[in-house]
Amino acid sequence: MMSGIFFTAFALQWAAIIAMALLIVGLFRQVGMLHERLGPVGALTLSGGAKVGETAPLFELPSLTGGEVRIGGTSTDGRSTLLFFLSPTCPVCKTMLPILVSMTKESRQSTRLVLASDGDEAAQMKMILREKLSDYPFVLSTDLGRAHGVGKLPYAVLLGPDGKVAAKGLINNREHVESLFEAQRTGIASIQDYMARRELAS
């Protein structure tokens, strides 16, 4: 009698565990689907700073990795400039660094990467050494961030060879960076601009 009760309880317990496991799997699938639906499909542009299509302000700044860096104005080598604003205390910025390095290496004939930050120089130098960024221009300038309307990080601005802002926005993944280059190619400034044009066309 007791063994029958024990067996029934044991079976019910396992049935409950299996049901919970199936429920958890189902929840993970739903979260994944929701993430795909709600995930941004392009870099989110913030208001403020030089607008897309406008000539970016010209800066000539010393680089923490050596030399002077000219940001803005007509490019002397015909390349675009991908200006990446970051901070040593920004974990997403750290995640984005290898992505940006990889992408700009692939397109180094047409694009150069310039890193920009502000704040404590010692902390920036530690990040440069830790993340192996000595091959890239790295500038410290609060005015540069203000000129481009940077309010949140990580943020990127793509300047065309003509010195005009081709695209800009918050970036959290590779797709966001690719959307900046796609915006430059198509002339559509941002995902917001794309949606606005689609609404006008409908």
What residue spans do the PLM features occupy?
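Short active-site neighborhood of thiol/selenol oxidoreductases, capturing the structured segment around
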Residues: 69-100, 112, 116, 177
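Thiol-/selenol-based redox modules, centered on thioredoxin-like
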Residues: 162-202
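N-terminal "domain-start" segment that seeds a small globular fold
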Residues: 39-73
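Thiol-based oxidoreductase modules, predominantly thioredoxin-like and allied folds used
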Residues: 109-125, 133-142
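A short acidic/small-residue loop/turn micro-motif
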Residues: 76-77, 155, 172-175
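Long, leucine- and charge-enriched amphipathic alpha-helices
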Residues: 1-49
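Short, internal strand/loop/helix patches
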Residues: 127-162
